[in-house]
Design a protein with these regions (language model features):
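Basic, Lys/Arg- and aromatic-enriched nucleic-acid-binding interface segment
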Residues: 42-44, 48-50, 67-125
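Catalytic-site neighborhood detector that most strongly recognizes the C-terminal catalytic loop/helix
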Residues: 87, 150-154, 166, 234-259
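N-terminal DNA-binding recognition helix of tyrosine site-specific recombinases/integrases
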Residues: 2-12, 19, 39-73, 124-126
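Short, basic (Lys/Arg/His-rich) helix/loop patches that form interaction surfaces
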Residues: 101-108, 174-179, 183, 190-232
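C-terminal catalytic core of Y-nucleophile DNA break-rejoin enzymes
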Residues: 82, 151-195, 207
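Conserved tyrosine-mediated DNA breakage-rejoining catalytic core shared by Y-recombinases
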Residues: 74-77, 82, 90, 121, ...
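C-terminal catalytic core of tyrosine-transesterase DNA break-rejoin enzymes
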Residues: 116, 120-127, 212-237, 244
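C-terminal secondary-structure termini that scaffold catalytic or DNA-interacting sites
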Residues: 175, 259-271
Length: 271
């Protein structure tokens, strides 16, 4: 996977099929990190493991005389968090939605709206930025759906647009643009999300990918949507991948327990 992603990066950013060690600049690793996490949508922990392998290869090349210098020895990449993904709860999502902005804060408001759209559709950053009118499909009942292939895996996603997503899409609509949403550079987007979190008073640190987890957990699974359906909407190749999102949350536990109590009362049973 590391070799394939490196080749993809070199083709996309250097317009070449390969690079020699002497052609590698010191910022090569950082650029690759931005490409892998931003444009491809890989987890930070996955990117970290790839960079570790690249540095090992460069060290071996220097030791064997294939490279004149020891490349990237002082370059450090964040390990990321490989634990279970975190999602915003209802309170945090409402705090984010309630934010108000002055006229000069249009970029910050746009970043908030794009993030909320991701929360209601489950689309990853790289897919969000590529969505266009051709990805909108109307079903027999007149409902609007997003239909696209994930850039990361190529797996087909079908997501019915909730009223909140439709409202945000209409707000961000611009006839002069082919894409459904305005383009925000990945680094700028992450910076805006940090500012939004602090402004809203949300304690949980979140990134672009938190929106995807929020869709899986708060918007769908906690509302009773079957995990098989959620898996299809997220573009997961197997349900097992989606099960990482399906851990029982306190809210879900309380709701299921309340349903159990109501069920036993209806049947005049005791627990």
């Amino acid at each position: 996977q590391t070799r394939a992603r490196l080749q993809q990066f070199i083709r996309a950013k250097h317009n070449a099929s390969d690079l020699t060690f002497s052609q590698l600049a010191e910022d090569f690793v950082k650029q690759f990190e931005q490409f892998a996490t931003g444009e491809v949508g890989l987890k930070q922990s996955t990117c970290y493991n790839m960079v570790v392998l690249v540095k090992k290869v460069c060290k071996l090349a220097y030791r064997e005389g294939a490279a004149d210098t020891l490349l990237f020895d002082n370059v450090h990449v964040d390990k990321g968090d490989s634990r279970l993904p975190k999602a915003l709860d209802r309170e945090a999502l409402d705090m984010l939605k309630a934010l108000c902005f002055d006229g000069w804060e249009a970029d910050l408001e746009t970043a908030r709206d794009v993030f909320l759209f991701a929360c209601y559709t489950g689309a990853a950053y790289c897919d969000l930025m590529a969505l266009n009118r051709g990805h909108l499909v109307c079903d027999d009942e007149g409902a609007l759906w997003l239909k696209f292939n994930r850039q990361k895996t190529g797996v087909l996603c079908r997501v019915k647009l909730l009223p909140e997503a439709l409202q945000l899409m209409n707000k961000l609509h611009d006839e002069s643009r082919d894409t459904l949403l305005p383009h925000i550079h990945y680094i700028t987007y992450q910076s805006h999300l940090k500012a939004l979190r602090l402004r809203a008073g949300i304690t949980l640190p979140f990134t672009t990918h938190t929106a995807r987890h929020t869709f899986a957990t708060l918007i769908t699974l906690e509302q009773g949507v079957p995990i098989e359906t959620v898996s299809k909407m997220l573009g997961h190749s197997t349900v097992r991948m989606t099960e990482r999102y399906a851990k029982v949350t306190p809210q879900k536990l309380f709701e299921e327990f309340d349903r159990l109590i109501a069920f036993t009362e209806d049947l005049h049973l005791t627990i």
